[in-house]
Amino acid sequence: MSDFFHSDVLSVSELNAFAKSLLENHLAGLWIAGEVSNLTRAASGHYYFSLKDSRAQVRCAMFKGAAARLAKPLKEGDHIEVSGKISIYEARGEFQITVNEVRLKGLGQLYEAYERLKAQLQAEGAFAAERKKPLPTRPQCIGIVTSLAAAALRDVVTTLKRRAPEIPVIVYPTPVQGAGSELQIAQAIKTASQRAECDVLIVCRGGGSIEDLWAFNEEPVVRAIEACTVPVVSGVGHETDFTLADFVADVRAPTPTGAAELVSPNRQESLHRLAQAQGRLKTVLEQRYFDASQKLDWLARQIRHPRQKLDEQRASIGKLAQTLSYSMKQNLRAHTARFERQTQALQHYRPDVSVCKNNIVRLQTALPAAFSQLLTHRRQSLTAQAALLEAVSPQHILERGFSVVKNTRGQVIRNADVLKQGQKLHITFADGETDVRVSKEQGQQDLFDCI
């Protein structure tokens, strides 16, 4: 730059280049407000127009890429705000703005309010991942907060019917743009939360200009989503549109259709996954069955059938029986041979058996007579001895008139001279007994007195 000031003379091109450098380096990032005039739209899709106010104007060029991002086409007389590259067209030395963005006049204040609320919510942790609620894998009911006339509602319902026709849908109708729409949207969200009829809630609307979507940047809507007890999926505008509702929602979908796809299990995909799982399960079960069959076959080979075991035992018993029979026959033959040998030996050394047999017969005949004679003799001898014993028995003597006299000690009194007067005696007769007392000495009359 100092080279320009030290030069004596500048060419026109140098002047224009210097001016262009100053403008591009020091006037970047500005927003310029004005009214559209002299609007021309080329066949290529570029816009050429002037932006003017009451005292001045500046030429503007908006190329096809930037023009495609417009919410709606520019028209003569629009009051807009533009941002872009401020420069000079060097060939003609014309001052111009190459426009990159366009917004309606007044949106600058809205954007400032947007940034303030966003910063506040950020500081409060409203966007924190840890407060996000997970979406249900298979919801039993899906709620939708949107306008009944919105194309977004048709898109969402069509997608849900295609993917999960068995899931019921509840619509909480509300205007989604216009004055006061933010309060009605917030109230619809609160109603869905209070009723707790749904497992997940879609808050959506179709695409539009920033002004059309602005209700979803308003604090009532953002606070209602933040306080909602039901997981919320936002599907506002197109994929390039971002609102504060997107930031505070539990999940942000790029479009309403995308929101419907997020909350609904794809029936075909579920059936496909189920078929795959079924196939894997079948493979596992078949492998387990094969392994079990192999193991069972191996065990069956290890375990003999009871009939086989019985046959083996029966065969073993048969062999043992044969062995035992053979052994018994052998023993019998051996004992028979031994008996025959001993019989032959006895026959060689025995006495005359017939003589002994005759003697035995004779003795057997004589034995009863001899025994009877002996018995008679013994009976006669016993009778004689009994008569003798009877003759000398004390009882027989007493029956002949005798008696037995005993003192008190049981001693028999054989002589009268041993008696004393007054002595007690016991006398035994043949037919009884009695006690007496000695009343007189020997030689006196009435020797005894009966007691």
UniProtKB/Swiss-Prot annotation:
Keyword Cytoplasm listed: yes
Protein name, as recorded: Exodeoxyribonuclease 7 large subunit
Keywords, alphabetical: Cytoplasm, Exonuclease, Hydrolase, Nuclease
Primary residence: cytoplasm
Subunit structure: Heterooligomer composed of large and small subunits.
Keyword set includes Acyltransferase: no
A Pfam family matched in the record: Exonuc_VII_L
InterPro entries: Exonuc_VII_L, Exonuc_VII_lsu_C, OB-fold_nuc-bd_dom
Cysteine-cysteine disulfides: none
E.C. code: 3.1.11.6
